[in-house]
C-alpha cells in the first residue's frame, strides 16, 4: 500500500510506525503548540530522519490559544493545568497588546519539521483571522520574551 497516513496520540505508537517506514505522513495532536512541544523531542526528529511528513493537529488547542477567554469554552471549575496556563498566556498577550492567535500560529510555523497545521474554521471570520495570523511577522524578541515568561 502506498501513501499511508497515521494519526494517534501516544508517542510510542508514532515511533513504532516511523520505524516501519510504512507511512508517508503522521498526524499528531496536542503535541506541538504554545502549551507543549513534546513532539519536538522524539516524533519530529524520527520522522525527519525517515523523510516523513508531519501534520500538527490542535495548534490552537480547540480555541484555547486564540485569545478568546478559556472560560468561554470550559467553565472555570472544570479547568486543568492546561486551561490555567492558556489563560495566563492570553493575559500575557493582552498586557502587550499582542494578538494571541498571531503568537500561537507563528510559533507553530517556526517548526520546519511540520508540514501542515489543520486549524479548522467555524466561519469566514475565523478563516480570515487564521490567514492573517499566518501572514503576520513577529520578531525573535517576542518569542524570547514569551519563553522567558516561563508559562
Could you say what each language-model-derived stretch is?
Residues 1-151:
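Beta/alpha (TIM)-barrel catalytic core signal, keyed to glycine-rich beta->alpha loops juxtaposed to Asp/Glu
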Amino acid at each position: 500500500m502506498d501513501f499511508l497516513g497515521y494519526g494517534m496520540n501516544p508517542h510510542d505508537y508514532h515511533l513504532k510506525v516511523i520505524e516501519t517506514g510504512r507511512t508517508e505522513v503522521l498526524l499528531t495532536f496536542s503535541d506541538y503548540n504554545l502549551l507543549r512541544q513534546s513532539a519536538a523531542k522524539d516524533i519530529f526528529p524520527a520522522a525527519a530522519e525517515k523523510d516523513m511528513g508531519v501534520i500538527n493537529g490542535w495548534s490552537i488547542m480547540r480555541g484555547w490559544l486564540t485569545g478568546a477567554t478559556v472560560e468561554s469554552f470550559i467553565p472555570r471549575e472544570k479547568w486543568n493545568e492546561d486551561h490555567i496556563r492558556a489563560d495566563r498566556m492570553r493575559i500575557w498577550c493582552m498586557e502587550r497588546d499582542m494578538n494571541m492567535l498571531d503568537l500561537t500560529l507563528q510559533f507553530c510555523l517556526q517548526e520546519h519539521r511540520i508540514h501542515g497545521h489543520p486549524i479548522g474554521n467555524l466561519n469566514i471570520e475565523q478563516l480570515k483571522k487564521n490567514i492573517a495570523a499566518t501572514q503576520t511577522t513577529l520578531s525573535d524578541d517576542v518569542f524570547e520574551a514569551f519563553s522567558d515568561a516561563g508559562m
